[in-house]
Amino acid sequence: MEAYGKILLIAMPAFLLLVLFEKWYGWRKGFDTVRNMDMISSLSSGITNVTKDVVGLYLIVLSYPFFLRHLALVEVKATWLVYLIAFVALDFAGYWIHRLQHVFNFFWNGHIIHHSSEEYNLACALRQSISGIVKTFAVFLLPAAIFGVPANVIAIVAPLHLFAQFWYHTRHIGRMGFLELFLVTPSHHRVHHAINPEYIDKNFSQILIIWDRLFGTFQEEQKNIPPVYGITRPVATWNPIRINFQHVWLLIKDAWHAHSWWDKLRIWFMPTGWRPADVAAQYPVYKIVDVYHFEKYDEGGNSFFATWIWIQMTTLLLLVSYLFANIGLIKSLDSSYIILYGIFVFIYVYAYTELMDRNKYAPIWEALKAAMAIGIIIYTGDWFGASGFVSGIQYVLIGWFLLSFAITVWLSKKEQGPTELSAAH
């Protein structure tokens, strides 16, 4: 937990700088692929994902060390070859997990957030799920466990393998020659994120494209078929927390409304997007039919509104950085404070992304955020030990949360109506 938090203190600013560089580069080249609100939504999703992992808001079932203890045929040392084997094993497992997430209704809920952006850029790589409360990833690492790959090797290689998937989420890099034969490139992954009929459910590989070539899911990017990004049932929100549970909520409602008990049971394991015929007829859900002519979810708003949202997210990044840098200190004050801090981060994200959506309940969420934060400060006399670093910081934070609430109420009244839509293509 603490080690991962320290890694993120380096990774987060690095990713943010690369995202901003892509925005600047696209602007300079006259090919801007990054919209402000979409980028903030993506970054906010990344914040919720890493916060969940750092504070431990999940349950691991059948962990890798369990399989290693019971299935390892040999005991091996952590040599460079073992690290290489671990990397390949993780990549192989990643391919099949990724494929399952696309194929079955229930598993799609854990991946929908990653495809929810209607753009394709570095920021959308940070759209990672928070809906997976129970982790069963280790089941797919059985080959590594059988061959005795040490658990600490997996622990080191896993985040590196994840971070290595960031760079190819861009439209600014074309074909890459011979590398296209064995590595996942931006061209390959653009196909994967596309909703064109020719591209959908292709290129599941994460680092080595060889898995798609071996298992029949490979598709080249075609010059005459420009990829169109997003999902066929658009999420129509900037709120990453709502996106994370939008699909499973639809499944729950469909299962409830279905007349057939067989449909109520099988809906969870049917192909992604399947709905009982009677439910689909009675409760239709919008789905994109022509991918070249649909309306993108757009931010609208003026420059002050956009600036305010940026200020909100930047302030949250500072608060999250404090959490990651001081996990040990916060736990020493009270072990429950880590979970409390994590819940606060989620409410913070929910509040300002509801404002981004022009949701009329945004001030209520902002009030809840302010009440929770000020309540923590009044009850403990501090902000999780922060006054030991900056004297009086708790009073500054009280002022900030009150100001934030006031401006949110003002903007909610000023920005009338739902977010406007603009033509996509």
Where are these regions (language model features)?
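Hydrophobic transmembrane alpha-helical segments in integral membrane proteins
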Residues: M1-F15
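Loop-to-helix transition at the N-terminal end of transmembrane alpha-helices
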Residues: I10, T33-V50, L333-I343
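Transmembrane alpha-helical segments that form the membrane-embedded catalytic/substrate-channel core
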Residues: F15-W24, V88-V103, H161-G174, T185-V191, ...
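Membrane-interface helix-loop junction between the first two transmembrane segments
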Residues: L20-I40
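Structural signal for membrane-spanning alpha-helices in multi-pass inner-membrane proteins
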Residues: G26, N49, V61-P65, H98, ...
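Membrane-embedded catalytic scaffold of the fatty acid hydroxylase/desaturase
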Residues: S44-L59, A78-I241
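Cytosolic/stromal cytosol-facing helical appendages immediately following the last transmembrane segment
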Residues: E119-C124, W167-I309, Y361, L397-H425
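Substrate-recognition/cap regions that form aromatic- and gly/pro-loop-enriched pockets
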Residues: Y297-P418
